[in-house]
């Protein structure tokens, strides 16, 4: 019987997080689909989050952000606004270490990017992103105030989302005071 790995023995998974602002300065959030995955199951009480995903080996983080955004939402019409000044980390809760994230990671190390959505809402497709080429990760989406998002996500990601708000909190004013 294999021993359950300890938090200290596991690395962080390199990922990207994506903040998409619409013309009103609100951000895109998606409601996670229910599944048997322990991490996703833990999110059923607070299933909303912004798009995010893993960085492939050798992949540039900005390229990964654009790829993940398309794979999860079908969005391609964006322009880069900003990149968070540093990596943002979150740790899995103790009962999920060695189980969630395929049991290989203690949490995630995320590089966050902010984009302006320059398309129309009809471009957004979380049901069959990429024309059905990508597995749906969300079953609903909506626009929300950036400052409200940390209260809508799972508690173990809240501190990371607070840092995202700190990094990009001035961006909504660019839309409302330009």
Which stretches of residues belong to each language-model region?
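N-terminal strand-loop-strand
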Residues: 2-50, 62
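N-terminal non-cleavable signal-anchor helices
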Residues: 5, 20, 133, 155, ...
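Hydrophobic (often cysteine-bearing) scaffold residues that line and stabilize catalytic clefts
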Residues: 12, 61, 157, 161
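Residue-level marker of positions within ordered structural domains that often coincide
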Residues: 23, 118, 166
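Unchanged
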Residues: 54-155
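Charged phosphate-binding loop/patch that engages nucleotide di/tri-phosphates or the phosphate backbone
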Residues: 146-178
């Amino acid at each position: 019987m294999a021993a359950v790995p300890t938090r200290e023995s596991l690395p962080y998974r390199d990922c990207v997080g994506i903040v998409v602002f619409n013309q009103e300065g609100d951000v895109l959030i998606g409601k996670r689909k229910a599944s048997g995955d322990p991490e996703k199951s833990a999110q059923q009480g607070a299933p909303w989050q912004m798009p995010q995903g893993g960085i492939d080996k050798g992949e540039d983080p900005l390229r990964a952000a654009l790829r993940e955004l398309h794979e999860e939402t079908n969005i391609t019409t964006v322009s880069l606004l900003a990149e968070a000044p540093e990596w943002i980390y979150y740790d899995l809760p103790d009962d999920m270490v060695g189980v969630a994230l395929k049991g290989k990671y203690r949490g995630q190390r995320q590089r966050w990017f902010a984009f302006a959505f320059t398309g129309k809402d009809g471009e957004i497709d979380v049901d069959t992103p990429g024309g059905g080429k990508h597995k749906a990760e969300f079953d609903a989406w909506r626009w929300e105030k950036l400052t409200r998002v940390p209260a809508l996500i799972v508690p173990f990601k809240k501190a990371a989302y607070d840092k995202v708000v700190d990094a990009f909190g001035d961006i909504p004013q660019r839309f409302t005071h330009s």
